[in-house]
Design a protein with these regions (language model features):
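Substrate-recognition/cap helix-loop segment adjacent to the acidic, metal-dependent catalytic center
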Residues: 85-106
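Substrate-binding/catalytic groove segments of enzymes
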Residues: 98-102, 122, 152
């Protein structure tokens, strides 16, 4: 996301579900000119080419997320992120004001960093070399979540699945 002190504007979003499904999209509506130096250096170069089908309007991203999250399904939606307050705002703004957010979408994102501290700050895997790509970060957060909640590192299970490329903030 772009954060210039006045706006939080979604650039891309990556989501990984516990069942292994993935969602990834890049907004066609953010203004790269408003990105600060850090985002220009660490985020924008990792985006797919603009001709990619992964570039979508905010409406298309919103609708894709509603389907991916199964907001009409029986399971409640639970969101987790590492220091995810601004990420949550960028997500919610896809629906406009908070009052327009579907009731199935949580009004908060659970905090992986706090879970890590509550578990005694256990050793975590290093950040991937290509971090700051929304999908790479989401995969890494899922890896950390599973490691903290089960004690198992899923990295060896992901190798085969990840070699096939990206599928889905």
């Amino acid at each position: 996301f772009i954060d210039n002190g006045r706006i939080i504007d979604l650039i891309s979003i990556g989501v990984v579900a516990e069942d292994g499904r993935e969602f990834y999209a890049v907004s066609t509506e953010f203004d790269p000119e408003s990105a600060g130096r850090w985002v220009r250096t660490h985020v924008l170069p990792k985006l797919p080419p603009p001709a990619s089908a992964l570039w979508r309007s905010r409406r298309e991203i919103r609708e894709g997320l509603e389907e991916f999250l199964g907001i009409d399904g029986p399971e409640p939606v639970e969101l987790w992120a590492w220091v995810g307050a601004y990420d949550h705002v960028a997500l919610c703004q896809l629906w406009g004001p908070m009052t327009s957010l579907p009731p199935q979408i949580p009004r908060f994102t659970r905090e992986l960093r706090q879970l890590w501290e509550d578990h005694g700050s256990p050793r975590m895997p290093p950040r991937p070399q290509d971090s700051h790509d929304a999908l790479v970060d989401a995969r890494h957060n899922m890896r950390r979540f599973v490691l903290m909640t089960t004690g198992h590192d899923i990295a060896s299970m992901q190798v085969g699945r990840l070699s096939g490329g990206q599928t889905p903030g």
